[in-house]
């Protein structure tokens, strides 16, 4: 059984290494064809047609009857005299101001120590020697002795500081039954041989949209903000495929 398990493990490891090598080879061919060229920007497309897209489902309140004000110059929820310029329908644009500043400094230290010692024997009982003569020489009076010691020492330190300030235009991809808007936007900027990507998605309440059709990222519910890149600099920062595979397979 042990030999069979070892054989299966070797076969699995070889299969994974072969797959990794094949993927690495295909990726290497693509990279060889792009030597000396800047990375290409992705095409503009409909985010709802992307693989893995799923409509947002949130708990909704009961529908309410819309009331209209008779003989009024203003429409409910309107902030402009002639027309509300804020995003309200699928396909409308909404500018998101990303202002993210995060700083964390956490330090933990734990120390634990425990020492126990037990010693038991039955050399004398009720005034008489239980072990005597030859038996006392062979069997010691101390029948059981235990000694244990446990020590635990742990330290943890987290220091993080992040700052991101930018703006990105998003598209309304869905209007929920309660009127909230699902927005998603992607921005790509190419500088030399590196592309910086900014992705913003989440749920927006129409009342939080400013009159200039902008909203702060802190007012987006279920916000998903990703800022990264791809290109030569990002490629150098990534470990090689073989190293990543070995990090997964090796238990130590």
From Swiss-Prot:
A lipid is attached at residue 26 (N-palmitoyl cysteine). GO terms for biological process: bacterial-type flagellum-dependent cell motility. GO terms for cellular component: bacterial-type flagellum basal body, distal rod, L ring; cell outer membrane. A lipid is attached at residue 26 (S-diacylglycerol cysteine). Its main location: membrane. InterPro entries: Flag_Lring (IPR000527). It is a lipid-anchor. Residues 1-25 form the signal peptide. One of its GO terms (molecular function) is cytoskeletal motor activity. It is found in: Cell outer membrane; Bacterial flagellum basal body. It holds the Pfam family FlgH. Keywords: Bacterial flagellum, Cell outer membrane, Lipoprotein, Membrane, Palmitate, Signal. Belongs to the FlgH family. Assembles around the rod to form the L-ring and probably protects the motor/basal body from shearing forces during rotation. The basal body constitutes a major portion of the flagellar organelle and consists of four rings (L,P,S, and M) mounted on a central rod. This is Flagellar L-ring protein. It comes from Nitrobacter winogradskyi (strain ATCC 25391 / DSM 10237 / CIP 104748 / NCIMB 11846 / Nb-255). The lineage of its organism: Bacteria, Pseudomonadati, Pseudomonadota, Alphaproteobacteria, Hyphomicrobiales.
């Amino acid at each position: 059984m042990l030999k069979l398990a070892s054989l299966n493990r070797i076969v699995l490891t070889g299969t994974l290494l072969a797959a990794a090598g094949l993927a690495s080879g295909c990726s290497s061919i693509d990279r060889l064809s792009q030597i000396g060229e800047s990375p290409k920007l992705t095409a503009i497309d409909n985010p709802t047609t992307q693989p893995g897209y799923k409509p947002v489902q949130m708990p909704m309140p009961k529908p309410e009857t819309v009331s209209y004000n008779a003989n009024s110059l203003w429409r409910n929820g309107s902030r402009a005299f002639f027309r509300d310029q804020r995003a309200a329908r699928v396909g409308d644009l909404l500018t998101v101001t990303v202002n993210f500043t995060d700083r964390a400094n956490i330090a933990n230290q734990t120390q634990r120590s425990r020492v126990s010692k037990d010693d038991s024997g039955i050399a004398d009982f009720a005034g008489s020697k239980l072990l005597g003569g030859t038996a006392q020489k062979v069997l010691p009076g101390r029948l059981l002795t235990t000694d244990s010691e446990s020590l635990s020492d742990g330290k943890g330190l987290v220091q993080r500081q992040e700052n991101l300030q930018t703006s990105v235009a998003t598209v309304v991809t869905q209007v929920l039954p309660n009127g909230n808007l699902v927005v998603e936007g992607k921005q790509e900027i190419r500088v030399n041989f590196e592309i910086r990507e900014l992705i913003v998605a989440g749920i927006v309440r129409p009342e939080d949209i400013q009159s200039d059709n902008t909203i702060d990222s802190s007012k987006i519910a279920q916000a998903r903000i990703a800022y990264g890149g791809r290109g030569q600099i990002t490629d150098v920062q990534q470990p090689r495929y073989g190293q990543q595979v070995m990090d997964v397979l090796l238990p130590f």
